[in-house]
Amino acid sequence: MSRALSQRARRTYFNNPLVEESLRYLPAAVEHPTSSAFRAYLIAQLPQSSVQTRQRFAEYISQRFSQDGQMNLALARALARYGDSRTGREILYFEMLQASPVLQEIASLWLAELPPEGSSRDSLLAFLERRLGGRDSDRVATAAVATFRRCRKISSPKPAVYIPVWSEPSPEAFFYVLARLYPERAMVRVEQLAGQPLLRAMLWPRPCLPGMLEAARRAGHVSKISELDQYHQFTLADSAEVRLGRLFGEPSSPPPSPTPEPEARKDPVPPKPVKKRKPAAGAPRKSKRKGRAEPVQLPLLPQDK
């Protein structure tokens, strides 16, 4: 039986990034939404000949991209849409940072702080030893560098020298990250967004954010961008689920209209009796027959004696 990773293990250990396998197989999590069902699917589908290797890789992927036994379906839908493309790799990289705090720390506090000429593997090992106390530093460094290479976040002009690759994301990758960082409709300051450690770990140049937000406004993910005095802020248009559905081109179904409650049965109200006015003395009375007036008995005149 599989054993879930502890919070400490998630924070201090990272191994076997399996980027290519994740890109290829994670879209199937839409049909296998629980971690146990997806793990069984991976064991049957992974190409490795050894059953033990398939089980181990299936465990890594299913645990990395699940929470409380449920797979990350936003990621699965994104990879079903974008696959092995620049956008797909950028989205997968973001979710790997989310899933592995130690990888996020390496990216935001070591890789993003490197000078333009880069640095050596020794500096990465020194960084990890201060955080991990020497435990598995070499293995974690190897896995982190492999992830950065696969997700195109570093270049190596010569062995064991790493240069960070800062690049503006595709609009689709930015819209996805915006939805995952802010799941509810809200007003957000641009400074708050720019200060997110995750955004720094993505190696997105800070000057690109205003243009990305304007693209989000045109695409309907942001409803308003405003600059008030010293505040530069934007308002998200909808919930994350609505924005992701729009991003993936999924048909949006209107919410079902509430079923009207049956009205209580009411007894018919009898009409109020109409009080007839008495005709004035001497006025001709209407006949009950239509079109005829009923003669009126006039008082007799006195007779001459």
What would you call each of these model-derived segments?
Residues 1-102, 106-112, 118-119:
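Eukaryotic partner-binding/assembly regions in large regulatory complexes
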Residues 52-56, 135-147, 203-215:
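Short amphipathic alpha-helical interaction segments
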